Amino acid sequence: MAVAGSWQPPRPCEVYRAEWELCRSVGHVLHHYYVHGKRPDCRQWLRDLTNCREWEESRSAEAQRSLCESEQVRVQAAQKHTLVWALRQRPPTDWNLPLPQEKDK
């Protein structure tokens, strides 16, 4: 178990600020609207930035807990997507045969 005073936020506060600014940028908003049909919700990045700064200033246990929960949710959301391609256990048996030659005429 780590020493109680040695905990650091999962990311530096500058990263939360950069992610929040990127989320609010015109290019990102347009891309997100094109792909998902709605504006991105940047409130979680702002909450994380606020909690990170609060933890740096006052070592708030509530801010620490909130940051940890937010990162866990973010990691779980990234892992829940299924693979597009089915992974093979071994290559096809005819992988080394020459390719068929198409006749142009």
From Swiss-Prot:
The lineage of its organism: Eukaryota, Metazoa, Chordata, Craniata, Vertebrata. Rapidly degraded by proteolysis following neuronal stimulation, resulting in increased AMPA receptor clustering. Interacts with RTN4 isoform A/Nogo-A; the interaction results in enhanced RTN4-mediated inhibition of AMPA receptor clustering. Also interacts with NCAM1, RANBP2 and CCT8. Keywords: Secreted, Synapse. One of its GO terms (biological process) is regulation of synaptic plasticity. Belongs to the UPF0545 family. In the postnatal brain, expressed diffusely throughout the hippocampus at a low level at 8 weeks (at protein level). At 16 weeks, strongly expressed in the stratum lucidum of the hippocampus (at protein level). In developing and aging brain, expression is strongest in hippocampus, especially in areas CA3 and CA2, throughout the dorsoventral axis. InterPro entries: Pants/Emi1-like (IPR021475). It is found in: Synapse; Synaptic cleft. Negatively regulates long-term potentiation and modulates adult synaptic plasticity. Stabilizes the interaction of RTN4 isoform A/Nogo-A with its receptors, inhibiting clustering of postsynaptic AMPA receptors at synaptic sites. Upon neuronal stimulation, degraded at synapses, reducing RTN4 signaling and allowing AMPA receptor clustering at individual synapses. The keyword Transcription does not apply. Transmembrane segments: none annotated. It comes from Mus musculus. This is Synaptic plasticity regulator PANTS. One of its GO terms (cellular component) is synapse.
